[in-house]
Amino acid sequence: MAPNSVAVTMEKPDNFSLLEINGSDPSSFPDKRKSISPKQFSWFLLLKAHRLISCLSWLVSSVKKRIAFSAKNINEEEDPKSRGKQMYRFIKACLVISIIALSIEIVAHFKKWNLDLINRPSWEVYGLVEWSYMAWLSFRSDYIAPLVISLSRFCTVLFLIQSLDRLVLCLGCFWIKFKKIEPKLTEESIDLEDPSSFPMVLIQIPMCNEREVYEQSIGAASQLDWPKDRILIQVLDDSDDPNLQLLIKEEVSVWAEKGVNIIYRHRLIRTGYKAGNLKSAMTCDYVKDYEFVTIFDADFTPNPDFLKKTVPHFKGNPELGLVQARWSFVNKDENLLTRLQNINLCFHFEVEQQVNGVFLNFFGFNGTAGVWRIKALEESGGWLERTTVEDMDIAVRAHLNGWKFIYLNDVEVTCELPESYEAYKKQQHRWHSGPMQLFRLCLPSIIKSKISVWKKANLIFLFFLLRKLILPFYSFTLFCIILPLTMFIPEAELPLWIICYVPIFISLLNILPSPKSFPFLVPYLLFENTMSITKFNAMISGLFQFGSAYEWVVTKKTGRSSESDLLAFAEKEEKLHRRNSESGLELLSKLKEQETNLVGQETVKKSLGGLMRPKNKKKTNMVFKKELGLAFLLLTAAARSFLSAHGLHFYFLLFQGLSFLVVGLDLIGEQIS
C-alpha cells in the first residue's frame, strides 16, 4: 500500500463504530503532512462525529436508567393519596423562588449595586434593570419583610418556651439524682418460699411478620423467674405468612414441652393492628384469673428477674396502675443513625419519663416493657383502635381515671433500634401523627374530667401542645423555611444566638444522659433539624386527620440481639426437625430442613474464607423528595449568604443543606434489602 494511501474498513455498512483509518505515520513524511484530500478529511470528521454521538447516546441512556431507577424508589413508603405531596409542592415553590432571587442577587452583586440601600435618589438610578431591582427592594422592605419578621418572632418565642421546658426537665432530673429519689418497696410483698404469694401475671407478646426476632422474645419470656403455675404467656401472632405461623407455633410447642405455661393465638380477622390484637387477647375467659398483664414487643428480651423487680411495687399501692421499665438497645453503636437515635431515647427515658414519673405520677406508656394492673385497663376502657398510639391512649385515659404510674430507670429491657432511615422515618411518622389524633379525641374528656386543674393544664399545654405540636412546628418552620428565606430578606435576618448558641446548648442538655455521644453533638443537631420535616408532616396529618395518620407499619427488625454462632443455630434447628416427624408437621419439617441447609451452606462458605461467595440480597437506596428539596433550598440560601459574607449563617446553612442531602439520598443508616 502506498504511504499516502488511506484504507477505510467497516464491519457493517450502516455502522461506523469499527471504522479505521490506516495510513503511514505522518511524522515520517513531514513534507506530506498537508497533503490531505477532501475525502480523507470527510471520513475523519465522520468518525469524530460518530464517536461524539455514541458518547452522547451512552450518557442519555445512563441518565434514563438512573431516572427510571430513582423513580421506582422515590417515596415508595408514602401513600399516593397522602397530603405529603402538598408539602413537596410547597418546598418546590420555595426552592424556585429562592433560585430566582439568588440569580437576581448574583447579577446585582457583580453589577456592584448597593444591596442594602433602598431609599436611593431616583436620579442615581440608571437603566430599566437597575430601576426594577430597586423597586423590588422597596416592595420587599415594605410588604414581605414585616410578615417574615412577625413569623420569625412568633417561632422564636415558641423556641424559647420549648428550650425553657427542656431546661426545667434537666433540672428536675438533676434534683432526682442529687436527692437519690427513686421508687422503693415499702414492705416485703412476696414470700419467696411460698409460690402462692406470687400474684397471677399474664405475659403478652404481640407480633406481626417478625421472623427475625420471634425466637428471642418467646425464649426470654419463657425464662422469666416466676412460678410456672402463676404465669401465662400469650404469643399473639398476627402474621399473614402461613410458613412463619408454623415456625412460631413450633417455637411455642418447644417451650410448652419444657413445662412453660404458654399458648399460641392467631386472629382470623386481623383488624385494629396492635391495639386490636391486644384487645382480642383480653377477651379470653381465663384472663379474669390474672391480676397483672405485662407486654413485650417481639424484639424485647427481658432479664429473668424482670417480674421480681416490677410486680412487687403494686403491693400495698392500690392506686398504682402501671410500672414502666427502661429500654436499652443492643445495636446502638451499629451506625450513625442508631447512635443519634440512642441520644434521643436516652434523654426520653432518663429525663422525661423519670421526671414525670417522680413529680407527676404520670407519663406516656411506651407500649412495651411495662406491667399493667388489669383492673386499671378495664376501668379505663381497655385497648382502643381509634389511633396508632394505643399505648399513649390508654395511659391518658388511665390518668384521667386517677391511676398513678411508676417509672423504674434501673430496670432495663433490651430491644432494637431501626437501622435504616426508611424504617426510622415510618416509625417517627407514627409516633408524631398519633398524639395529634389522640389530642383531638381526648380534649373534651380532659376538660370534663375530675382531675385537678394543674393536671389538666399539664396534659393540654405540656404533654400535648408543647412537646407534641409546638416542637415539630417551630423546628421545621424556623430552621428549614424562615432561616433560608431571611438570606434573601436581610431586614428579617435571624440573630446568631437563635441559629447557633441556644441550639447547641439544648443539644448539650440532650446529650448529658449519654455522655459517650458527645462527639456526635454537631451531627445530632443537624439530624434533628433534618427529621423536623417528617415530624412536622406527621403532626399536620394527625391534627387534620389526613389518610397517612391512620397508617400502621411494623418497624423492620434485624434480629441482632439473637445473633449467635451459626453452627449452634443449625444444630438447634436440626434437633427441632428430628423431633417433629408427625404427619401433620411434614410441611414444617421441610421448611426447617431448607432453613438448616441454608444456614449450613452459609457456615461452610464463611469457613472457606470467601472461596465461595454467598448470594447477597441486593440493597437499594431510597430517594426522599422532600428532604432533597429542602437540601437544595438550604444550599441555595447558603450561596446567597456567601455573597453577603454572613459567616456563621453560611456555615450553618451549608452543613444543614448537606445533612438534608445525605438523608435525601438515603446515605445514612443501612440500606433496604
Swiss-Prot record:
<keyword id="KW-0808">Transferase</keyword>
<dbReference type="GO" id="GO:0048868">
    <property type="term" value="P:pollen tube development"/>
</dbReference>
<dbReference type="InterPro" id="IPR029044">
    <property type="entry name" value="Nucleotide-diphossugar_trans"/>
</dbReference>
<comment type="subunit">
    <text>Homodimer. Interacts with XXT5. Interacts with FUT1, MUR3 and XLT2.</text>
</comment>
<dbReference type="GO" id="GO:0005768">
    <property type="term" value="C:endosome"/>
</dbReference>
<feature type="transmembrane region" description="Helical">
    <location>
        <begin position="469"/>
        <end position="489"/>
    </location>
</feature>
<dbReference type="GO" id="GO:0099402">
    <property type="term" value="P:plant organ development"/>
</dbReference>
<protein>
    <recommendedName>
        <fullName>Xyloglucan glycosyltransferase 4</fullName>
        <ecNumber>2.4.1.-</ecNumber>
    </recommendedName>
</protein>
<feature type="modified residue" description="Phosphoserine">
    <location>
        <position position="581"/>
    </location>
</feature>
<dbReference type="Pfam" id="PF13632">
    <property type="entry name" value="Glyco_trans_2_3"/>
</dbReference>
<feature type="active site">
    <location>
        <position position="238"/>
    </location>
</feature>
<dbReference type="GO" id="GO:0000139">
    <property type="term" value="C:Golgi membrane"/>
</dbReference>
<feature type="transmembrane region" description="Helical">
    <location>
        <begin position="90"/>
        <end position="110"/>
    </location>
</feature>
<feature type="transmembrane region" description="Helical">
    <location>
        <begin position="648"/>
        <end position="668"/>
    </location>
</feature>
<comment type="function">
    <text>Beta-1,4-glucan synthase rather involved in the synthesis of the xyloglucan backbone than cellulose. Seems to work simultaneously with xyloglucan 6-xylosyltransferase. Xyloglucan is a noncellulosic polysaccharides of plant cell wall and consists of a glucan backbone substituted by xylose, galactose and fucose. Associates with other xyloglucan-synthesizing enzymes to form multiprotein complexes for xyloglucan synthesis in the Golgi.</text>
</comment>
<keyword id="KW-0472">Membrane</keyword>
<keyword id="KW-0328">Glycosyltransferase</keyword>
<feature type="binding site">
    <location>
        <position position="297"/>
    </location>
    <ligand>
        <name>substrate</name>
    </ligand>
</feature>
<keyword id="KW-1133">Transmembrane helix</keyword>
<feature type="transmembrane region" description="Helical">
    <location>
        <begin position="144"/>
        <end position="164"/>
    </location>
</feature>
<dbReference type="InterPro" id="IPR001173">
    <property type="entry name" value="Glyco_trans_2-like"/>
</dbReference>
<dbReference type="GO" id="GO:0016757">
    <property type="term" value="F:glycosyltransferase activity"/>
</dbReference>
<dbReference type="GO" id="GO:0000138">
    <property type="term" value="C:Golgi trans cisterna"/>
</dbReference>
<keyword id="KW-0812">Transmembrane</keyword>
<comment type="similarity">
    <text>Belongs to the glycosyltransferase 2 family. Plant cellulose synthase-like C subfamily.</text>
</comment>
<dbReference type="GO" id="GO:0005802">
    <property type="term" value="C:trans-Golgi network"/>
</dbReference>
<feature type="transmembrane region" description="Helical">
    <location>
        <begin position="623"/>
        <end position="643"/>
    </location>
</feature>
<keyword id="KW-0597">Phosphoprotein</keyword>
<keyword id="KW-0333">Golgi apparatus</keyword>
<keyword id="KW-0961">Cell wall biogenesis/degradation</keyword>
<dbReference type="GO" id="GO:0005794">
    <property type="term" value="C:Golgi apparatus"/>
</dbReference>
<feature type="active site">
    <location>
        <position position="391"/>
    </location>
</feature>
<dbReference type="GO" id="GO:0071555">
    <property type="term" value="P:cell wall organization"/>
</dbReference>
<feature type="transmembrane region" description="Helical">
    <location>
        <begin position="494"/>
        <end position="514"/>
    </location>
</feature>
<dbReference type="GO" id="GO:0042803">
    <property type="term" value="F:protein homodimerization activity"/>
</dbReference>
<feature type="binding site">
    <location>
        <position position="299"/>
    </location>
    <ligand>
        <name>substrate</name>
    </ligand>
</feature>
